[in-house]
Structure formats: structure tokens, C-alpha cells
Amino acid sequence: MTFLRLIFLACFWTSTAGVAAPQVAVDVGHTLAAPGATSARGRSEFTFNRDFAGELVAALRTAGIDVRAINFAGDAGSLAERPAQARGSDFFVSVHHDSINQEFLEFWDWDGEEMSYTTLKRGFGIFVSRRNPDLAGSLRCASAMGAMLRRAGFVPTPWHGRKHQPADADNGVWYYDNL
């Protein structure tokens, strides 16, 4: 997690240089009522998202950045509610983990329970909406994050190219306008 914190902080400082008292809104994807897929070891997407978002919030606050935490309790009423709660923030990050379609899953026993997993889809993707108010800044940040992930040995997945136009495919950045 430390490396990912550094990636975000480097990108954030680059994109907000010269701005006084920035505020970052950090949103936890999914909810307790709709927790998303379950991992190969029984953890929900919401749990992964909340854990990572908690690490990110801690790193930002340690760096002296004001943070607006969104949906950490898992009770967000709707998707539209989240950006509304972030309104006025300088930067909005929504943390998600991606699942895969049922037909690509294999099964195994984990602690006496049958769980699913995949070996097909690996890697990362970073999504940017063309409808956001600072597309150029968001693309610079996303590309910088992807480049840092690649230098650390992570691999961007081409999987998202099936449904999304590339913004910077080499660095795992894709357009997704329905964020």
C-alpha cells in the first residue's frame, strides 16, 4: 500500500501545484447492501475498496491534505449521491476493484468453502470520464499513475479495450464516461 500512496501523492501534487489548501474527496466503491463480487478468499469488493481508501485517506492526511471521506460506512444511497457529496473538492477519487464475468471463473476450496477465481484477467486499469471539468489534468494524473505502476512492475490490462476507448493504453488509462 505504501507504494500506491506515493503514486497518488506524486500525481496529486503535480496536478495541484500552486493551489492553496486542496481538498481531495475519496469515495469507497460499492455499499454494504450491494458489496460487489466476492474474492477468491471470501472478501467483498466493498471491503477491498474501503481498506485501500482508508490507506489513501491516512496518507493524504499525513501529508497535510484535507480529505472528504465518502461512503466509508457503506450506506451511500445512489451513485449520483457520491459526486454530489464531493462537490467543491479539488480532486475526486473513487476506489474500485474489478470483477469478471461468470463464464471466466474457475472454482477452488478456500477454508472449506467453494470460492471462484480467475487466471485470465490480471492487471490494472485507470478510468477517466471525458465529462469531468478538468479532463486534461485528470488525464495527466491518470497517465502518471499508470506509468508509476508500470515502473513498479505492475502490468496494465488490455481487457478494458473491449468496451472502452484508450486514453493512454500503454499506461492503462481508459475513457469511461458513465462514471
What are these regions (language model features)?
Residues M1-L179:
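Catalytic-site microenvironment of enzymes
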